[in-house]
Amino acid sequence: MGPQRDITRRLLVALVASGAAGLVLAAPSAASTECRAGHGSADVVGKPGPVVAWRAALSSRVPTHTRVPGRKKTRRAGTARTVGPGDAPWLLVLRAKNDRKGRCWVRVRLPWRPNEAGAWVRAQHVNLRPTRWRIRVNLAERTLVLHRGRRAVLRTSVVIGAPITPTPQGLFSIVGVWRWNPADFLGSYILPLTAHSPVLQEFGGGDGRVGIHGRGGESLLAPLGSMASHGCIRLPNGAIESVVRRVGAGGLPGIPVRVR
């Protein structure tokens, strides 16, 4: 995160203030309500793997559960109790299973704290779609790699969090896609993640959400390969533009982002 800037706060303000910047969403189509979706080798909805992962599209708010309901009494997950497209239009599917009645449930990555929070939702309440895209961030090497299946299609050096404000590690997903001013500190695109700073509970008026974004203005002073941000992952504008162009703005929300 740049100096005195919080991605969540800036994005919301910008969306209200200007029609030029906006969240680009994919339009959900016909839903798959089965744990087996019938897409060849990826027909079984399950955990993210090296070849395919699954995204769950939200068209309305749905209840979340800490476990798949069965004989034991269950409670809804977290304080929000429901998750909707205003939180994240697409959620990363972590696994799937059937309940005692044969109904399919999917465990999804939640877009709020704590990091790597997850909950179960009914598969019939979401649209399930496979994706072959994933992103891996190597903190030791200061690199980001975009994969399509097992093939790496883009590799770039990045700026990561400073030692006192480290980039969080874990399995996250992209929340949205924002086109931005290339000359601004945040560069040409911003991809907010489900990740939050492990040390900054709030930042610049927001909740310390971490994202992937470009570089411009003062952020160019920190060279690629350095540890200088408040947790965000900074790419060259050309690299993040290539990510958006290759995957498509509608295909990015919900794809897995592994940071380690």
Feature locations, PLM:
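N-terminal secretory signal peptides that target proteins for export/translocation
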Residues: 1-8
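A structural motif detector for short, solvent-exposed N-terminal "entry" segments of globular domains
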Residues: 123-162
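Beta-loop motif signature
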Residues: 33-99
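Exported/periplasmic cell-wall-interacting domains
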Residues: 34-35, 112-114, 125-134, 162-171, ...
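N-terminal export leaders
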Residues: 9-13
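Boundary regions of SH3-family modules and the immediately adjacent low-complexity/disordered segments
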Residues: 33-52, 109-137
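SH3/SH3-like beta-barrel superfamily modules
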Residues: 82-125
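Bacterial N-terminal signal peptides
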Residues: 14-24
